Amino acid sequence: MVMMKLFTSPTCPYCPKAEKVVSKVAKEEGVLAINLPVNTDEGLKEALKFGIRGVPALVINDKYLILGVPDEGELRQLIRKLKGGEEYGAS
């Protein structure tokens, strides 16, 4: 199962666009996406775990990090590879 964690902030001007892209791709590709605002205890804890210092930031399967607003096509391509078991570096 592919899982995306989107780190956002209420004051971030780019986060609404990132949320829209991630939500659309998650729905259309049938994967789980959660929004973690960094101004909450849970969001901050998770962000620190991944070394995230700016938002928006997207973590996929606790392995892949995309900073900024993700490109819809590239995100969709990565998700399809992960769903197909073609993880980069997998043995």
UniProtKB/Swiss-Prot annotation:
Q: Name one GO biological process term.
A: cell redox homeostasis
Annotated disulfide bonds: 12-15
Q: Which Pfam families match?
A: Thioredoxin_3 (PF13192)
Q: What is this protein's function per UniProt?
A: Acts to maintain redox homeostasis; functions as a protein disulfide reductase.
One GO molecular function term of this record is: electron transfer activity
Q: Where found, per UniProt?
A: Cytoplasm
Keyword tags: Cytoplasm, Disulfide bond, Electron transport, Redox-active center, Transport
Which species does the entry assign this protein to? Archaeoglobus fulgidus (strain ATCC 49558 / DSM 4304 / JCM 9628 / NBRC 100126 / VC-16)
Organism lineage reads as: Archaea, Methanobacteriati, Methanobacteriota, Archaeoglobi, Archaeoglobales
- Please list the residue ranges annotated as the Glutaredoxin domain: 1-91
Give the chief site where it resides. cytoplasm
Q: Which family does it belong to?
A: Belongs to the glutaredoxin family.
Q: Would you tell me the protein name for this molecule?
A: Probable Thioredoxin
User: Which GO cellular component term is one of those annotated?
Assistant: cytoplasm
Tell me the InterPro entries matching this sequence: GLR_AS, Thio_glut, Thioredoxin-like_fold, Thioredoxin-like_sf
